[in-house]
Amino acid sequence: MTDSFPRQAARTMGFTLGAPRSFRLSLDGETVIFLRSRGGTDPVTCLWALDVTTGDERLIADPAEVGKAGAEDDPVEKARRERVRERAGGIVAFATDAACTIAAFAVGGTVYLADLRQGGAAVDSAAGGSAVGGSAVGGGSIGGSTVGGSGVRELPTVRPAADPRPDPTGAHVAYVSEGALRVHEIATGTDRVLADPEGADGISFGLAEFIAAEEMDRNRGYWWAPDGSAILTSRVDETPVQFWHIADPSNPAAEPRSVRYPSAGTPNAVVSMFVAALTGDFIEVSWDAAALPYLVTASWEASIGHPLLVVASRDQRDMRILAVDPATGVTSLVRADTDPSWVDIVTGVPAGLPDGQVVWTADIGGAKRVVAGFEAEHAAGTAAVLTPDSINVREVLGTDGDAVLFTASAEDPASITVWTAGPAALERLSPADGVYSAQQAAGTLLLVSRTLADSAASVRVLRPGSAGEPRAEVARIGSLAETP
C-alpha cells in the first residue's frame, strides 16, 4: 500500500530524517563534520565526517552503538532540543576544537568525546548508510575508557551534562551540570567546577536563557578563550520570571508542569557575565545592564584578542558592541547602533578578520550592509562599508582570510544567495535563484542549496579552479531523506 503524504510526513518527521545538517568545515578545508541519521525513517542522529579530497564519508559516532539510542534527556537538554526544534533522538549538537581533531557531544546526560583523526568506518551513503568494513563507530582511542573499543569514549563527568565544548587547543572539555559550569581535563580526567550557583534555585551558569534561545538565535551561554585559559560565561537568574503551569491533556490525573515563562511585559531573567579562568580567578564583567539588559551574543576570537559582547535595550532600539578587558571585567564601547523602531539582530556578527578588524552589519542607505574596521574606526563611525545598497545582508557566515562570507538578497527577496566581500572584490558564490548557506575555509567552499527543483537540500564541496577557472565540485554529502 502506498503511503499517504500525511503518513509519510509523520513517519519521516517532516522529511528531516536522513538529511545532513550542522556542518563544521575544518580550518584547512579538508574535512567536514556533520550530523545525519542512517536513513529516512531512522530517528537517531549520528556524527559523520567527510574527507573532502577522497569524497569518502565516515560514521564517527552512532548513539545506538554506545547504548544511548533511546536515552531520555535531562530537563536542560530537553529544553535545548525544544529551542532548536529538534524532534529526532541521538546527537542534537556537537562542538570541536579549533583544529577539528576531537568532537564532544552529549546523549542522555552523558558526555562523549570522539577522535576525528582516526575514528570512523567508511560508509556508502547511497546504500542507506551501511558501514563498509570495520565497526559502525570508529577505531582508535584518545585514552581512558572507550566504548566498544571504538574511537568514541565516554568522559567520566558529573551527570546530567549538557552542551559540552572542547577548548580551542583540545586539552579540556567544558559542560554544564545542574546549573554549574564545569571543566574536564582530557589527559588526566580531572573534573572540577568553574562557576557554581551553589544550589540556588533559578540560577545557572553557561546556559542561554529562554529569550536568547527563542528570540535572539543564541543557543549557548559560554565561550572559550582562544588559548583555552579561561571561559566567558553567562550567569542567568530566573527568579524574577513568572511561572506558567502546563497540563497534559492526555493525562488529566498528572499534576501540571511548572515552567518559568517571560511573557510580554513581565520580568525577564537577569543576565550577567563573568570571566572564569582555569587558575580560579572569577571576574564579573561590568556594563549598564539596567539600560541594556539583553545579552544578544558574545565572542572571543584570537584575531581580536579579547571578548566582545553585544547588548541591547529591552525595546531593541539601542544595540551596542562592548569590548571586555578579561583581566578586570571593565568594558568599553566599540560602536552603538540605534533606530526609532528597532535594531535587527543579524546572526554571525561580530566576527573578526585576521588583522583584528571587527565585522558588523549596519543599516546604511536603505539596506543592511557589511562593515569592517578596527575598534577605533567603529567608534569614530569610519568603518569601511564592504557591500553595496543593491543587496540586503541576511547573515554573516564567517570569514576566510580577509574575505567575509555572508548571505544576502538582491532583486528577489525570496532568494537568499551566498556572497563574499573583501579588499579585492564582491562576488556571488551561489546561483541567483534559491536559498543557500555556506562555510568557507582555506578556499574550500561548502555550499548548501535549496531550490524548487529538488525536495531535498544538496550539499556540495567546491574548490577554486586553476588559472582563473570557476570553482568545481570535488565532493558531495549525500542525503538519505525520503522523497515526498
Describe each model-derived feature in a short phrase:
Residues 22, 435, 439-484:
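Serine-hydrolase catalytic core recognition
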Residues 1-426, 434:
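Beta-propeller folds
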